Amino acid sequence: EFYGGGMSGLSLADRATIANMAPEYGATMGFFPVDHVTLEYLKLTGRSDEIVGMVEAYLRANNMFVDYNEPQQEKVYSSYLNLDLADVEPCLSGPKRPHDRVPLKEMKSDWHALLDNKVGFKGFAVPKEVQDKVAKFSFHGQPAELKHGSVVIAAITSCTNTSNPSVMLGAALVAKKASELGLHVKPWVKTSLAPGSGVVTKYLLKSGLQKYLNQQGFNIVGYGCTTCIGNSGDLDESVASAISENDIVAAAVLSGNRNFEGRVHALTRANYLASPPLVVAYALAGTVDIDFEKDPIGVGKDGKDVYFRDIWPSTEEIAEVVQSSVLPDMFKSTYEAITKGNTMWNELSVPTTKLYQWDPKSTYIHEPPYFKGMTMDPPGPHGVKDAYCLLNFGDSITTDHISPAGSIHKDSPAARYLMERGVDRRDFNSYGSRRGNDEIMARGTFANIRLVNKLLNGEVGPKTVHVPSGEKLSVFDAAMKYKSAGQSTIILAGAEYGSGSSRDWAAKGPMLLGVKAVIAKSFERIHRSNLVGMGIVPLCFKAGEDADTLGLTGQERYTIDLPENISEIRPGQDVTVQTDTGKSFTCIVRFDTEVELAYFNHGGILQYVIRQLTQR
């Protein structure tokens, strides 16, 4: 919950952006209490005085309205975190995680450190002798070049930033100033603009600024999840070849929420989150290897250097265009017909049967196997005996590593499944769009192209070693080989396993692959709960221990000594894990509540709920 004197100066659009980032700062939700700013937004979006008055009266009557003109009752929280808004400065996040914040003024020095650092969340290990490499190529007959840090994707995208008038119109003002000075984005930078709603399009047009965004290549591509989730589409073949053949660490700059490895695009190893105005600025610069305070962005039509300060709009300029361009009637006209649908929606054939009719030919919706063979009696706790290690991970394996939501790689098991059913590559769509098909999502589990699995001894990609045979296989194929032989599997991991988006498929997928337990140094809170919900046992190494300190390679077989009776299992109890090499160690079983034990006893939360419903 956010509180304090700075609240009154924070717009509702800014609050929405911060609240939407809750998973990134480890919260289930971010709550801003209703105050006068909320009421002003209701008026701005076309709500009647009667509705606004009722909202205020109701919340005041329930002591849920914050009035900064009245004496504030001191609130008591379990813990406190103070932020002085005067300390806030322009920044980006990247290149591989949203919580790796980089102040704008430090971007160039940070980039050079990244090239030097060993491979990791803040390193690419590019040898000194090739850090200045220039990859020259022909872009549709035009001479072009890429270097480490060259921006090849610049996208104004996300579900909240793109509904924030100040940053959207701010980006348009940057484009306007750049166009007037004679600056233009290089044609090989893939630019796009996905407004947060139809209202955004209306006020960009009303302001007269959309034409400047168009001039810089930021044309409106549609509404919905685009580059942020990996739906940027292919890069031009010449650009893709230049990156691949010269091993260029190319960059994407986007106004999205998340930049986990492999999410934005397979060919952009460096992915930075930035505000929409900064996205335009970096697109114009064409590189993240730049100090905006000292280095020119480009050369204007008068032959003089143009700097960041020359194209950056003032707060007053932005406020003026917001005031004149964002009007209540825009919200009314856009949303008054929202429940009427459009012609295509209204012409859809809708079955009238009480039960859903599964289409066996559909590659989007498939009947999941969760309830097949289910009986009314709970199966009880499942033990883990002589399980093989499917994957051996280090720290910070995110839900994007576990269950990517972006594009389906042409050589992946999911692609193979689709092609076998006559789906053309251009129609693969994304994992996110096909989350209603368990066959595809199971094949997409651990399909992240940046996956680092210690069983592969340094090789990066969505593969593993099938321990009994020594074969190197896709994770899905190896998992199916274990399942067909009746062999259970476990996963070894480091700290922060399951961080990132709270994605249910990151727990469903491993369950479908036959994973029975995950042994990690620590878990992201929501993901640990999701694992329990799918019947997977989360175990934590004891403090100071992990797979490496215990000498575990992942080549062993693991037996987890769980009691067979659920009444003998307690939240947080110690359990012994034994290996076939003679090693044994103690872990903490991370069932944290009694209800989680009930889920485990039933085989998962889905089975638990079904049994509860049928008993009513």
Swiss-Prot record:
Pathway: Carbohydrate metabolism; glyoxylate and dicarboxylate metabolism. InterPro entries: AcnA_IRP_Swivel, Acnase/IPM_dHydase_lsu_aba_1/3, Acoase/IPM_deHydtase_lsu_aba, Aconitase/3IPM_dehydase_swvl, Aconitase/IRP2, Aconitase_4Fe-4S_BS, Aconitase_4Fe-4S_dom, AconitaseA/IPMdHydase_ssu_swvl. GO terms for molecular function: 4 iron, 4 sulfur cluster binding; aconitate hydratase activity; iron-responsive element binding; metal ion binding. Its cofactor is [4Fe-4S] cluster. Its main location: cytoplasm. [4Fe-4S] cluster binds at residues 159, 225, 228. GO terms for biological process: citrate metabolic process; glyoxylate cycle; tricarboxylic acid cycle. Keywords: 4Fe-4S, Cytoplasm, Glyoxylate bypass, Iron, Iron-sulfur, Lyase, Metal-binding. It catalyses: citrate = D-threo-isocitrate. Substrate binds at residues 258, 263, 421, 502-503. It is found in: Cytoplasm. GO terms for cellular component: mitochondrion. Binds 1 [4Fe-4S] cluster per subunit. Catalyzes the isomerization of citrate to isocitrate via cis-aconitate. Belongs to the aconitase/IPM isomerase family. This is Aconitate hydratase, cytoplasmic.
